[in-house]
Amino acid sequence: MSPSGSTKGESSGLNQHYEEKVRPCIDLVDSLRALGVEKDLNLPAIAVIGDQSSGKSSVLEALSGVALPRGTGIVTRCPLVLKLKKITKDKSWHGLLTYNDKIRELKDPAKIEKAVLNAQTALAGIGEGISHEMITLEIQSCDVPDLTLIDLPGIARVATGNQPEDIEKQIKSLIEKFIKRQETISLVVVPANIDIATTEALKMASTVDPTGQRTLGILTKPDLVDRGMEDTVVRTVNNEVIPLKKGYMIVKCRGQQDINDKLGLVEALEKERRFFDENVHFRSLLEDRKATIPLLAERLTKELVEHIAKNLPQLQNQLEMKLEKTSADLRGLGDGVPLDKNEKSNFLIMKIRQFNDVLERVQMAEEDVEKPNTRVFSKIRSEFVKWKRILDSKAIKTEETLRDEVQEYVKTRRGKELPGFVNYRTFENIVKKHIAELHEPALKLLKDVTDIVHSSVDHIVNAHFSSFSPLMRAAKDPTEDFLHEQFQRAEEKIHSQFRMEKIVYSQDDLYSDQLTTAKNTLRGYGLQSPNVSADVREMAYHLTSYLTIACERLANQIPLIVQYHMLNQYISQLQNAMLGLIGKNSPGMLLCEDSGVARKRKDLKERLERLKSAGRVLSKFVHSA
């Protein structure tokens, strides 16, 4: 038997219209996959899926010309990347099996099946479990099409034998990982002798691709179709039953009896063509180029090349975004800890200095922020604005309700004064009542600003020291202690401020000016009405004047207290404490890097190299196209 598994006449004509475009396109994706960037990028691909015993392995066997693992139960236990390369100069057959960083050259196609089985056992273990790890089988021959396919495990509905109980869920999860990508064409293999609407493979494909834009149906086993059902099969292939954008094709591969009779793959292709040519029902499908393995190979190559070309711009965008993010993540982790003792000390000084510099910029409201984030002081300023609104609303509310309030006081507490004389004690009591109502909002302002500063500093500590647990702990203690200390000091000052506000005081000229303004302003509030007594009118003027002055004083004083303690003093204390760590502790103790961080840095460096290599491959392809 020829290792090619295809008739010379058919295979020599395969893809002759695409020879200049086909190989470079497919080589591009194969090269990217070989670099390992499939972990990072969604590469254009054709994934082959089907229920168990759908004939999926037989189709791949016919396309590749080699015997692949087949039988009952789960045959494909790992994703198998089948890379077929058509060569013209060298007539010899070459095989290359790669998995888990192992490479095995194969000179005899008869050894493929066992080699793939051994690879599956190495990755998925003994038994019938599956693995997400990929096996790559590359075949170079003059008789194969230029094509790359990904063979996925057949869908099992019920666990049998020593299969895991959740084997169906595992397989579906693996299949979905591939076919849900917009870059993947799903090649759905379905036996022609069953109702295709009941197949799990087609259901899965339609779930992730409801319009059938990325799905091509392949019907197998046409020789097993019940008599009278042939027209239904023809209608299915003609896209009249369950329409798919890419439509359907039909093939007849070797059955078990053919294998038992030692029917070679070359003879099987000849037998397939005769079957369609001589079948009165299916002959039209052959005439429409919708039947036989060679025509399927040609169609798949065309589909893959067009799909790669279509997805190339998105692939380039994906690559650029991943490169940018990986570089940023790597910068965020920083360099690893030096081994030299002196260099370690310098490294610690650098880390603390960088941390303190960021704190300084926060204090000066000059830190760098990326959208949609906001500078710390901008958030604090928003809280100060809210505080000012509270004071303003207090003044407005006072003007609106003052008349009734003063009338009540005059009615219940007026002494021997003649009309028009202001009772100073009544004036003081009303002032103190209104100012006392501002005490709690002032304390809330302090708490809200403290939360903003705490969150920001905590984020900065994590950003700079999260890789070093001892240094992180050393930084966390003063962060919390000094915050609590400055909060208490600010809180006491606010209490003190409101105790002072119980003393009713203002400079005479300031008060006189404000009183004049109040009299001019309040005339519109009904205070000139004959129903308002002179006592009420005069008291309202004085109260409005004083509360306006007091609110203006508090509008500045409370934010000053909060800013001084929770930003200036707190950050200065924290900076000094961090500098103090340099002399107190051994750099080696503080700079003990978490193993997870070192591993992540290594992974990011490897990813960056993969992506850069992929970028060079893509760039070379684009410029040579």
UniProtKB/Swiss-Prot annotation:
GO CC field: cytoplasm; microtubule; nucleus; plasma membrane; presynapse; synapse
Residue numbers binding GTP: 50-57, 151-155, 220-223
Compartments where located: Cytoplasm
Annotated stretches, region: G4 motif: 220-223
Positions of region (G2 motif): 75-77
Chain residue ranges for the region called G5 motif: 252-255
Species, as recorded: Danio rerio
Stretches the record annotates as G1 motif: 50-57
Main location: cytoplasm
Protein name according to UniProt: Interferon-induced GTP-binding protein MxE
Domain GED, first and last residues per copy: 536-625
Assigned keywords, A-Z: Cytoplasm, GTP-binding, Nucleotide-binding
